Design a protein with these regions (language model features):
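Ribonuclease/tRNase effector modules and their secretory precursors
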Residues: 1-89
Length: 89
């Protein structure tokens, strides 16, 4: 499994944490699904230091400036997103 992704569009270098790798196994997320979300997903900022990349129900939570900073953003966790319930009339 790749744990380092150089030159991710719009982000630069991204490293995948051990926690994120473990969550992928727990949730049954394939490496292909991770790459699709990371490389082609929509980006949502969540405060100054965190952003998400999400595609096809897979969300990658990324720290922009992890400490200690080693020159890459850190994909802190990966998980499946379930659609929210919607009320119908």
């Amino acid at each position: 499994m790749d744990h380092y992704f150089p030159d991710v569009p719009g982000l630069g270098n991204v490293a995948l944490s051990r926690h994120a790798q473990a969550r992928m196994v727990e949730d049954g997320i394939s490496e292909h699904d991770l790459k699709e979300a990371l490389l082609n997903g929509s980006t949502t900022p969540d405060g100054q230091d965190v952003l998400w990349r999400e595609k096809d129900g897979v969300r990658v939570v990324i720290l922009r400036q992890p400490m200690p900073f080693k020159g890459a953003m850190l994909a802190k966790t990966v998980y499946r997103v379930r659609p929210a319930a919607r009320a119908t009339k």
